[in-house]
Amino acid sequence: MSMKAPRGTVDLLPEQSIKWQFAESKIKEICHNYHYQEIRTPLFEHTEVFQRGVGDTTDIVQKEMYTFEDRGGRSLTLRPEGTASVARAYVENKLFGSPNQPTKLFYFGSMFRYERPQKGRMRQLNQFGTEVIGSEDPAVDAEVMDFAMNIYKSLGLKSVKLVINSLGDQESRESHRNALIQHFEPHREELCHDCQNRLDKNPLRVLDCKKDRDHPAMGTAPKITDFLNEYSKTYFADVMTYLDALDIEYVVDPNLVRGLDYYNHTAFEIMSEAEGFGAITTLAGGGRYNGLVEEFGGPSSPGIGFGMGLERLIMALEAENITLPIDQQLDCFVANMGDESKLEATKVVKRLRDNGIQADMDYQKRKMKGQLKAADRYQSKFVIFLGDDEIEKQEVTLKEMSTGDQSEVSMSQLVEVLQEKLNGGKIYE
């Protein structure tokens, strides 16, 4: 038995985890500003949720899902994406009955896909996503894309671009579907096995094929934008009008096709143009899904959302050499001398922590020199020296590590003095 992490998974160690925490906290600030609320759905669902929601002709459903039977014989699947689960929860919990519409939701969570592991593509991936359900308004589409772009900009990323397209409504998609079949049918035998099947079930998927993307027929395939009816054209034009009003730069790519069946009308991706990012440049993707809620038995509830991989977000930050303003310094280290002072040190550390001051102490029975080295490694801003004399006098020696200044502080005033020296921003209430 291998005592290593399974293929396609990684351990997120503290030096990386702190970057994730910073990014996640920044994202949550933006969620608050845009008035989105968090939802948490199960890690696994009934397999039918993804078969019906994502589409049984997609690569995700046919090749990439982790599906198993429980002891009751029920087919369950680890979630490969977030939107289908949110739509299921929206219907099951009757969120459509709330007077506060549209419903604006966000989520963080692990997704699972059986893919060939490579840089930026893992079998367990961590995703942030948003869903706005209950409105078919071009202004909402623009808001969602603005939201996504704002995340990258707030973290200092500059080499990102927004790419958009319209997949049209059902009528437009049907016209495009028929044109695609006519176009690719003469080349059927030249296409890969998967695309031959897709041509019958969902020819739009042929355009998203990795194996056949260099086939000459791909370059001359009919574009969805040539088949948009008046409503779809007007809707897409209105989306672009709102993007222009928000000063959001974008590129229209008529070849942009999202890999999930539920998308219609607006589709978009955010890509990195940073040198050294690698072959996989997509950071986030999303679009509109007006029929998904009905697929789960709910009322007509148009929706739009996006998902972004947190692994790729961190990769993009590293590709642009962005150093996050993370304070990794410890507020205070309590150095003690002897068993009696160690007992007192535990009480001092607890009092500091209870008042919102980050504090630590020695648990390795180090001598004073070793404890000071530990304080240096923790980049501690202050060190409290606590020995028998300090306990008897009920005062400690407080040293500011950046200047070397030392002062005697009474136990009763320690918290107040330390909070003031730490700029008074961490008072516990």
UniProtKB/Swiss-Prot annotation:
SUPFAM superfamilies: Class II aaRS ABD-related, Class II aaRS and biotin synthetases. The keyword Membrane does not apply. The keyword Ligase applies. Its main location: cytoplasm. It comes from Oceanobacillus iheyensis (strain DSM 14371 / CIP 107618 / JCM 11309 / KCTC 3954 / HTE831). It catalyses: tRNA(His) + L-histidine + ATP = L-histidyl-tRNA(His) + AMP + diphosphate + H(+). It is found in: Cytoplasm. Gene3D superfamilies: Anticodon-binding domain, Bira Bifunctional Protein, Domain 2. GO terms for molecular function: ATP binding; catalytic activity, acting on a protein; histidine-tRNA ligase activity; transferase activity. It is an enzyme of class 6 (ligase). GO terms for cellular component: cytoplasm. PROSITE patterns: AA_TRNA_LIGASE_II. Keywords: Aminoacyl-tRNA synthetase, ATP-binding, Cytoplasm, Ligase, Nucleotide-binding, Protein biosynthesis. GO terms for biological process: histidyl-tRNA aminoacylation. This is Histidine--tRNA ligase. InterPro entries: aa-tRNA-synth_II, aa-tRNA-synth_II/BPL/LPL, Anticodon-bd, Anticodon-bd_dom_sf, His-tRNA-ligase, HisRS-like_core, HisRS/HisZ, HisRS_anticodon. Homodimer. Belongs to the class-II aminoacyl-tRNA synthetase family. Its EC number is 6.1.1.21.
